[in-house]
Curated annotation (Swiss-Prot):
GO terms for cellular component: chloroplast. Signal peptide: none annotated. This is Maturase K. Belongs to the intron maturase 2 family. MatK subfamily. It is found in: Plastid, Chloroplast. Its main location: plastid. It comes from the Eukaryota. GO terms for biological process: mRNA processing; RNA splicing; tRNA processing. PANTHER family: MATURASE K. It comes from Anomochloa marantoidea (Herbaceous bamboo). Usually encoded in the trnK tRNA gene intron. Probably assists in splicing its own and other chloroplast group II introns. GO terms for molecular function: RNA binding.
Length: 510
């Protein structure tokens, strides 16, 4: 515990930031609005309407903030707060959205300053390619082939919202900002009469995405902060024994009793915790913990993580959230890919003087394939096909021009091929291309009240070129053809791109 306190003291901010006065500046809300329009937020397949920005309404909001001391009222009298309440539903929604977006922008400033002030800032540009999602897969190819067991963890949430505020209190010493955060949480819970935290989290995630991402990332950052500290300390467990490991879970409440009952227990050495080859990867609210150790070691880590969430976050994690599997005989869903470690046979010819030998061996390989069922299910939800994969027209797009329809379908197809370029089997991708191509043809035919055959004959090669992917364009320069056509099976090699910074819409579509 002493080591943990020292470690926490080193990680605290050395300066006290007062970000609350920035909420009374109009440019903060304009910046938040512009950031929402120009940010990397994915555009939904069915489209969405951006919230309009009004400087007049922002000025009215700032005046109301000056007139009401809502920071104190939100704690003492949460039901008597009228800052965001308005007879007009639009005004109430606008005040709520723009204030939460501005608050998220302001409260991120201390965390941004912390990153910029790190001594390794000169080395950051060298690793910009690591922002790509695909950069994780070469890491898995290099490391997972030598590991034995894997734990698939669903990071538990929501925890109690007051705990989230307390977590931020350790990082931000601005009391007024923390009161404002409590005000937001009380406002949403009272406005919708919600008692279950899961519904409140869903509401924040839907209507105030930036604020939700900030709260969720703060919570996950705190989890990883302690996990990495304990992971570093686990290398010392060979000297301190499993008994001390158990006592850390229960915060040393039984240490003296243990010492009296079993005086020689703490001098034992248990080698099972010595595991230098443990790797951790987090994505989409999930995490993968892979190890070269024994099943007993993975079970102990599972128990430890469950106790960690229970005692530190007061949250009971269901056992199903941590699934343990042997890496050799199982597959796992990772960033839209269905990944597994396979053993491929390899015949090696060994020539020794006059004799030749054929040696059969097996090599491990990380196999990444496209999950056909889930991807077709996403296309079905987006109304490109039926549940069985039969292409259908998209009536909502018939009001667009022919070029816009072709461009939308072609862009979706190219993005899917681009994201799944690392797949070792491309048959599923060609099936997806067929679905999108025929869905596009039926949409255009429905718009012009014609048949698919007639429309395809009229467009000809122009229609096919829209669904020509980047890889096929490179191959078309090498193998010239009069009519562009997809090269089935001609490029089975996996390609990992370094410009993919978010998961494809259809991969993460719900």
């Amino acid at each position: 515990m002493v080591k943990l306190e020292v470690y926490l003291e080193k990680q605290k901010f050395r300066q006290q930031y007062f970000v609350y006065p920035l909420l009374f500046q109009e440019y903060i809300y304009a910046f938040a609005h512009d950031h929402g329009l120009n940010g990397s937020e994915p555009v939904e397949i069915l489209g969405r309407n951006n919230n309009k920005f009004s400087s007049v309404l922002v000025k009215r909001l700032i005046i109301r903030m000056y007139q009401q001391n809502f920071g104190i009222n939100s704690v003492n009298h949460p039901n008597q707060n009228r800052l965001l309440d308005h007879n007009n539903y639009f005004y109430s929604q606008f005040y709520s959205h723009i204030l939460s977006e501005g608050f998220a922008i302001v409260v991120e400033i201390p965390f941004s300053l912390r990153v910029l002030s790190c001594p390794e800032e000169k080395e950051i540009p060298k690793f910009q390619n690591l922002r790509s999602i695909h950069s994780l897969f070469p890491f898995l190819e290099d490391q997972f082939l030598h590991l034995h067991y894997i734990s698939h963890i669903e990071i538990p949430y929501p925890i109690h919202l007051e705990i989230v505020v307390q977590l931020l209190q350790c990082r931000i010493q601005d009391v007024a900002s923390l009161h404002l955060l409590r005000f937001f949480l009380n406002y949403y819970s009272n406005w919708n009469s919600l008692i279950i935290s899961m519904k409140l989290i869903f509401l924040l995630k839907k209507e105030n995405k930036r604020l939700f991402r900030f709260l969720y990332n703060s919570y996950v950052s705190e989890c990883e902060f302690f996990f990495f500290f304990l992971r570093k300390q686990s290398s010392c467990l060979r000297l301190t024994s499993y008994g001390t490991f158990l006592e850390r879970i229960h915060f040393y409440r039984k240490k003296e009793h243990f010492w009296v009952m079993y005086p020689g227990f703490f001098r034992k050495t248990l080698w099972v915790f010595m595991d230098p080859l443990m790797h951790y990867v987090r994505y989409q609210g999930k995490a993968i913990l892979a190890s070269k150790g024994t099943p007993l070691l993975m079970k102990k880590w599972k128990c430890y993580l469950a106790n960690f969430w229970q005692y530190y976050f007061h949250f009971w994690i269901q056992p199903r959230r941590i699934q343990q599997k042997p890496l050799a005989n199982s597959c796992f869903d990772f960033l839209g890919y269905l990944s597994s470690v396979t053993r491929n046979p390899l015949v090696v010819r060994n020539q020794m003087l006059e004799n030749a030998f054929l040696i059969d061996t097996r090599i491990k390989k990380l196999d990444t394939i496209v999950p056909a069922i889930s991807l077709i299910g996403s296309l079905s939800k987006a109304q490109f096909c039926t549940g069985s994969g039969h292409p259908i027209s998209k009536p909502i797009w018939t009001d667009l021009s022919d070029w816009d329809i072709l461009d939308r379908f072609g862009r979706i197809c190219r993005n899917i091929f681009h994201y799944y370029s690392g797949s070792s089997k491309k048959q599923t991708l060609y099936r997806i291309k067929y679905i999108l191509r025929l869905s596009c043809a039926r949409t255009l035919a429905r718009k012009h009240k014609s048949t698919v055959r007639t429309f395809m004959q009229r467009l000809g090669s122009v229609f096919l070129e829209e669904f020509f992917t980047e890889e096929e364009q490179v191959l078309s320069l090498i193998f010239t053809k009069t009519i562009p056509f997809s090269f089935h099976g001609s490029h089975s090699k996996r390609i990992w791109y370094l410009d993919i910074i978010r998961i494809n819409d259809l991969v993460n579509y719900s």
